């Protein structure tokens, strides 16, 4: 007599698997890197195979991709968008300008997106190739799979 297969896993692994395979980035394209980000969404690189669908609303997104030069005028707006995203949320800083201000070392440029929002992954380059953004997404998926989905300070009992 053949028995039905049994799948054993933890709730953490199950939640993290679902989260890592359904990342919906909020696109925040500001300069040249935005063109490379748009190319990543095209058919040649096929972001959809990772379960990734670009969203224009922060309330439907869990990943923010900051692509390009961040000015001080945009910083407050970007922070507001970040605050509107539901938890858990992650940030990818794409390109030298988003990482460190790039060649724009002026009074009007934020010298790194991490001064405004917490950044999880930094992509170097000017502008990073679409393959680099795909690799960053795979690294983020791995990071999500290894994280704790259930907070330790959560109540032990629901009733």
From Swiss-Prot:
The cofactors it requires, by name, are: [4Fe-4S] cluster
Q: Which UniProt keywords apply?
A: 4Fe-4S, Cell inner membrane, Cell membrane, Iron, Iron-sulfur, Membrane, Metal-binding, NAD, Quinone, Translocase, Transport, Ubiquinone
Cofactor binding description: Binds 1 [4Fe-4S] cluster.
Its Gene Ontology molecular function terms?
A: 4 iron, 4 sulfur cluster binding; iron ion binding; NADH dehydrogenase (ubiquinone) activity; NADH:ubiquinone reductase (non-electrogenic) activity; quinone binding
The family note in this entry says: Belongs to the complex I 20 kDa subunit family.
Oligomeric state and interaction partners are given as: NDH-1 is composed of 14 different subunits. Subunits NuoB, C, D, E, F, and G constitute the peripheral sector of the complex.
Q: What is this protein called?
A: NADH-quinone oxidoreductase subunit B
Organism equals Helicobacter pylori (strain ATCC 700392 / 26695) (Campylobacter pylori)
């Amino acid at each position: 007599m053949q028995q039905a297969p049994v799948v054993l896993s933890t709730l953490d692994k199950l939640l993290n698997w679902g989260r890592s395979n359904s990342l919906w980035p909020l696109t925040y394209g500001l300069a040249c890197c935005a063109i490379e980000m748009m190319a990543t969404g095209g058919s040649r690189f096929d972001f959809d195979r990772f379960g990734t669908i670009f969203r224009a609303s922060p309330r439907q997104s869990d990943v923010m991709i900051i692509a390009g030069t961040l000015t001080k005028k945009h910083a407050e707006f970007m922070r507001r968008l970040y605050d509107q995203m539901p938890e858990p949320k992650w940030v990818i800083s794409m390109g030298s300008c988003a990482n460190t201000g790039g060649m724009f070392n002026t009074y009007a440029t934020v010298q790194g997106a991490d001064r405004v929002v917490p950044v999880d992954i930094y992509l170097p380059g000017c502008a990073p190739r679409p393959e680099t953004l795909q690799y960053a997404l795979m690294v983020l998926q791995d990071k999500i799979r290894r994280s704790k989905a259930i907070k330790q300070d959560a109540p032990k009992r629901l009733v």
